[in-house]
Amino acid sequence: MAQKKVNAVIHSQEKLAEGIYSMWLDAPEMAKAAAPGQFIAVYTNDQSKLLPRPISICEADKENGRLRIVYRIAGAGTKEFSAYKEGDTLDIMGPLGNGFPLKKKKAFLIGGGIGIPPMLELAKNLDCEKTAVIGYRDKDTFLADELRKYADVVIAT
């Protein structure tokens, strides 16, 4: 699929932890083409911010045509994203990047903080024994329960 910018509708948005948000976007073509480890470029609706924010794809729901991103507020652009509501729209481009190789060997997934979201789609797609070691700065262990559905999870804080 050639990457192109599309205007996606926000299906839902939820605060997972302090400064961490989960957003589902209606983007059927991108969801169908997405692979574990890829990302999308997310544009703000504020035209003074020219550059998109690269955000990893957390999940791709190919059946319903949706992408899930989980992001941390790190500046003005992601702070703007956190104020969006269901039904709002934003421009996205993707899927971008090469993604992760999916080999049928034992997998050891390691990630911390905002590096954890792309591990969820990878764990769902790997057809092998999986252990995920995930780290957090504090007690807010977002996505840990979701990862437990697909891998043995070890938490480091």
Show the residue positions of the predicted features.
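Ferredoxin-reductase
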Residues: A2-E86
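FNR/FR-type flavoprotein reductase catalytic core
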Residues: A76-T157
